[in-house]
Amino acid sequence: MQKLLIIGAGSFSPEVEELAGLLGYTDIAFLDDNPSTAYCTPVIGTTADIASFRSQYDTAIVALGNNNTRMKYHQILKDCGYTIPVLIHPTAYVSLTAVIAPGCIIRAKVVVSRDVKLGEATILNVGALIDHHVEIGYGCHILMGAVVRNKAKVEPLTRVESLSLVE
């Protein structure tokens, strides 16, 4: 049984939960500071409890859309010694030469071409196209259908809107 602790139970969390399930995680729980508005269960605590759940869960990831907040909790997970996975949807194409840092979430129908570098805790949303030799910094969120052209550089904590073109 693969266990996963997900930080955040808001509107993005069901997508991450489903993806984790597709990848073999069978025991998934959530920490959220507003459990009454959670989209997923079980919410077993708040973000103040991250360190205390380390003995029960060795693997954790952040499912928050806000880049700064996602990076804050990603760093806390690292500091607490959690293993932070990369979640790649089975329908995504990721080149064997791409370098994907921990905490990245790559959703359905994404294409990541040759020699791409993705920084920690970056989200590539449904249908994003990342061309060859692209560098995407840590904590970025590339939204649905966005295209990042060859050799482009996306600065850390950047949000690229749906259907945008980055050259």
Model-derived features with residue positions:
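Generic structural signal for conserved hydrophobic packing positions in ordered secondary structure
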Residues: 8, 20, 60, 73, ...
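Short hydrophobic segments within beta-strands
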Residues: 6-7, 31, 63, 143, ...
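A solvent-exposed beta-alpha-beta segment
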Residues: 1-58
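Short amphipathic alpha-helical segments
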Residues: 17-20, 72-76, 118
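Phosphate-bearing ligand-interacting subdomains
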Residues: 35-93
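Short alpha-helical
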Residues: 11-14, 68-69, 99
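Small/polar loops that bind or transfer phosphate-bearing groups
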Residues: 8, 61-65, 114, 150
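Structural signal for interior beta-strand "rungs" in well-ordered beta-sheet cores
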Residues: 86-167
